[in-house]
Structure formats: structure tokens, C-alpha cells
Curated annotation (Swiss-Prot):
Keyword Disulfide bond applies: no
Organism, scientific name: Novosphingobium aromaticivorans (strain ATCC 700278 / DSM 12444 / CCUG 56034 / CIP 105152 / NBRC 16084 / F199)
Binding positions (substrate): T298, V299, T300, G301, R302, K303, R304
Lineage of the species this protein comes from: Bacteria, Pseudomonadati, Pseudomonadota, Alphaproteobacteria, Sphingomonadales
InterPro entries from the UniProt entry: Adenylosuccin_syn_GTP-bd, Adenylosuccin_syn_Lys_AS, Adenylosuccinate_synth_dom1, Adenylosuccinate_synth_dom2, Adenylosuccinate_synth_dom3, Adenylosuccinate_synthetase, P-loop_NTPase
Self-association and partners: Homodimer.
Designated gene of the protein: purA
Main location: cytoplasm
UniProt GO molecular function: adenylosuccinate synthase activity; GTP binding; magnesium ion binding
Protein name: Adenylosuccinate synthetase
Record field: catalytic activity: IMP + L-aspartate + GTP = N(6)-(1,2-dicarboxyethyl)-AMP + GDP + phosphate + 2 H(+)
Task performed by this protein: Plays an important role in the de novo pathway of purine nucleotide biosynthesis. Catalyzes the first committed step in the biosynthesis of AMP from IMP.
Record's keyword terms, sorted: Cytoplasm, GTP-binding, Ligase, Magnesium, Metal-binding, Nucleotide-binding, Purine biosynthesis
Pfam families assigned: Adenylsucc_synt
Family: Belongs to the adenylosuccinate synthetase family.
Cofactor: Mg(2+)
Length: 429
């Protein structure tokens, strides 16, 4: 049975939630494999709108939903999100939801450190969500992390807390802050532990069991390839690997099981926070894209920066992540533009580049080379077949897939699950 891995092929916010929701309705299991509660997903099912930050999108449809070991978990944010969804009528229990017992925890001290660093950085800040994601990953790599399984052994946590607090106390002192209140931290963990542990298990084992039974598994990526800690616009990146290869290491299944890689691509480009953005439009056109696309973050509410489609960046993302096909989203936002542009290359100090350079100084200086196309006056909103699309919109889609050297598998024409043009079904072998 075919599996599917969904990743964002830009800077996140590509519309993954709707696509994952559509795929999740046909999957037997949905797995989050990286990131934390810093990446928002908005799902629209009928008249109901669900906003998720941590839980896999499959939870809304009752599909087995799993948080893998590659995620960093804020247990208090988890509880709040579950309570919000159950209030909307979503049933969540140990049968349809599981957390990897080796998943690292985000603690209050991580949120503290995140905020202190951003505040101290001033104009040079990265633009994190301030939710402790980065510091939690640092402690994981530094072998200081407290993990979900540790919640069952809080009385044996002294040595781990010694290492963790020694590290954070030194950092906090540098910011003029008092040491970590260990007693308060232990008490908070003791209170939340039973809630989290009811869902904890070796999820690699459960995934292996459902895989052997022929289940369709959907691996749900967060953010986007251009925010990958290795391949993104460093240092303006997230703290995890967002490429498709992480689906294996972040879930406990081998790379051969990750299946069809579906890259989610917005028909234009957006970015939240600081960092290079070659096609950014700081004019009326950029404002029009933002207003029509409702470009505000699900988690932070921050206004997104907007610009024309960058084929160079998306081609690079697709190559790095081994994308099999893309889902092109929010095409309807371009409806009514007399002309539309696509970035096909860059100029940098007299040279033409067909890739995005690695150094921050070069990234900041590249100038986009545009190809201009006629726009379309008709609407693409709600289209469910090629026959519903204006001819020029079809030409735009064809040009996008030519330039990114990756075929279009489906086109999304509204937030509604049914408003999708299917070219190739990712779940079909």
C-alpha cells in the first residue's frame, strides 16, 4: 500500500492543512515527524473551522494520529489544544492518538530562553514564535532533554535536572535572570504527567504494526523546506529538518516507507518574519496578494510578506526533498491580475544564477529575473476540473511545473476540501 509524505516547498504557510485533511480522510494513520506547536494548520470541514498547531490533521477525521519522536512537545500546549478540539466535538483518546515516548519536551525554561534571546537580539532577531522550539531542540542534541518517558520516572530525574538547570542557569544569568525554579518545574511536570502518559507509547512499534497490516500512512510535515536548519535561509530558519527525509528519522519507520513525496506550493510566495525574500513586493501588488490570500499566521497572527512565485527556490526545494509531485494552492488569489510574474533566475554581482546561494550576504543581494505572463479575468475559485479553469490559468500552471521540473499532482482552488483538481492521486501505487 502506498504511503505519502507531505512537506511545504516554500517558507511554510503553503496551505498544507487543507491538503493533509483531504489525504487524511483516506489514510489509516497520520504522523507528525518534526517541529512543535509553532506551525499552524487551518482546516475547514463543512461549516466548522479547526485551528491546529501541534496535533496531526488526521485527528479531526478520527484517523489514527501520531506525534513522532522528531517533534518537540509542549505538554501544556497539547492539553489546551486537545481541550479546544474536544469542545468542538472531536473525539480524542488513546485509541486514535499516540505520542512517541521518546519525544523531547518543551518546558517553561525553553520559552523563557527563546523570549530573552529574541528581546536581546533587537533588530537582528530571527523572528521565532517565542514558544521554546529552538531551545528544546538544543537540549535534545545536547543530551539534556527531558522526554515523555521521563514523566513516568520523575523521582529519578535529579541527575538530568542537574545537567539541564546548570546549562540554563548560566544562560539566564547572562540575561540578568534568576536561576530555574526546580521545585516549581518538578511540580508542574508532576501535574501534567498523567495527562500526557495516557497517550505515550513506542510509536515506531505501532506504526510498524499498521504498516505490516497494509495501512496507508500519511507523514505530515510542518513549515517548509526553505526553513530547514540545513537547507533553508540560514540563520533565518527553524530548528529542525523540514525536508522529506526527516519523515523516517522523526517517526521510527525506515526511509523506504515514506512513499510519494507531495510538495505543497503556493501559487505565489509568502514569508513570515525576518530573512531574505528575493521576490518580495512591498507595494500595492504585494498588499493585494496579502489581502486576497488572508495572509496572517495561524499561530502568531503575524502579517506575512508577499511576492511573486519563485521557481528557482521551489525547484531547489523539490530537488532537495525528492518531491514526486506538487499540490499547487491558492491559485484563486491570482484571479483578476492583468499580468503575473514568475522568477526564473537571479542576478548576483553581474552573474546569472539558477540556484539560491547558501551565504546570507549573497541571499540578501540576489535580484530576481522575471518572466511575465498574461493574467486571467475569469475565476478559478472552486474549480474542480481543468474545464473549470480559464485558459491562461492553465498556462500558468503548466509553466510552473516546467520551471520547477516537477509535475503538478493536484491543484487547490479554495479552502474547501472538495475544491481540488486531481491530476495524480498520491495514494495510488
Amino acid at each position: 500500500m502506498a504511503n505519502v509524505t507531505v512537506i511545504g516547498a516554500q517558507w511554510g504557510d503553503e496551505g498544507k492543512g487543507k491538503i493533509v485533511d483531504w489525504l487524511a480522510s483516506r489514510a489509516d494513520a497520520v504522523v507528525r515527524f518534526q517541529g512543535g506547536h509553532n506551525a499552524g494548520h487551518t482546516l475547514v470541514v463543512g461549516e466548522q473551522v479547526y485551528k491546529l498547531s501541534l496535533l496531526p490533521s488526521g485527528i479531526v477525521t478520527g484517523t489514527l494520529s501520531i506525534i513522532g519522536n522528531g517533534v518537540v512537545l509542549d505538554p501544556w500546549a497539547l492539553k489546551a489544544e486537545i481541550e479546544k478540539l474536544t469542545g468542538q466535538g472531536v473525539e480524542i483518546n488513546a485509541e486514535n492518538f499516540a505520542i512517541a515516548d521518546n519525544c523531547p519536551l518543551i518546558l517553561p525554561l525553553h520559552r523563557d530562553l527563546d523570549g530573552l534571546r529574541e528581546q536581546a537580539a533587537g533588530a537582528g532577531k530571527i523572528g521565532t514564535t517565542g514558544r521554546g522550539i529552538g531551545p528544546a531542540y538544543e537540549d535534545k542534541v545536547g543530551r539534556r532533554a527531558i522526554r515523555v518517558c521521563d514523566l513516568a520516572h520523575l523521582d529519578a530525574l535529579d541527575a538530568q535536572l542537574d545537567r539541564l538547570c546548570a546549562h540554563h542557569d548560566a544562560l539566564r544569568a547572562g540575561f540578568g535572570q534568576p536561576p530555574v525554579d526546580r521545585a516549581a518545574l518538578i511540580e508542574e511536570l508532576r501535574e501534567i504527567a498523567p495527562y500526557v502518559l495516557q497517550f505515550a507509547q513506542p510509536v515506531w512499534k505501532r506504526l510498524n504494526t499498521v504498516r505490516k497490516a497494509g495501512a496507508r500512512i500519511l507523514f505530515e510535515g510542518a513549515q517548509g523546506v526553505l526553513l530547514d536548519v540545513d537547507h533553508g535561509t540560514y540563520p533565518f530558519v527553524t530548528s529542525s529538518n523540514t525536508v522529506s527525509g526527516t519523515a523516517a528519522s522523526g517517526s521510527g519507520l525506515g526511509p523506504a516507507q515514506t512513499g510519494f513525496v507531495l510538495g505543497i506550493v503556493k501559487a505565489y510566495t509568502t514569508r513570515v518574519g525576518s530573512g531574505p525574500f528575493p521576490t518580495e513586493l512591498e507595494d500595492e501588488t504585494g498588499q493585494r496578494l496579502g489581502e486576497r490570500g488572508h495572509e496572517f499566521g495561524t499561530v502568531t497572527g503575524r502579517k506575512r510578506r508577499c511576492g511573486w512565485f519563485d521557481a528557482v527556490l521551489v525547484r531547489q526545494s523539490c530537488a532537495i526533498s525528492g518531491v514526486t509531485g506538487i499540490a499547487l494552492t491558492k491559485l484563486d488569489v491570482l484571479d483578476g491580475f492583468e499580468k503575473v510574474k514568475i522568477c526564473t533566475g537571479y542576478r548576483l554581482r553581474g552573474k546569472v544564477l539558477d540556484y539560491f546561494p547558501s551565504h546570507a550576504a549573497d541571499q540578501a543581494e540576489v535580484e530576481p529575473i522575471y518572466e511575465e505572463m498574461d493574467g486571467w479575468s475569469g475565476t478559478t475559485a472552486g474549480a474542480r476540473s481543468w474545464a473549470d479553469l480559464p485558459a491562461q490559468a492553465i498556462k500558468y500552471i503548466q509553466r510552473v511545473q516546467e520551471l520547477i521540473e516537477t509535475p503538478v499532482a493536484l491543484v487547490s482552488t479554495s479552502p474547501e476540501r472538495e475544491d481540488t483538481i486531481l491530476v495524480r492521486d498520491p495514494f495510488v501505487d
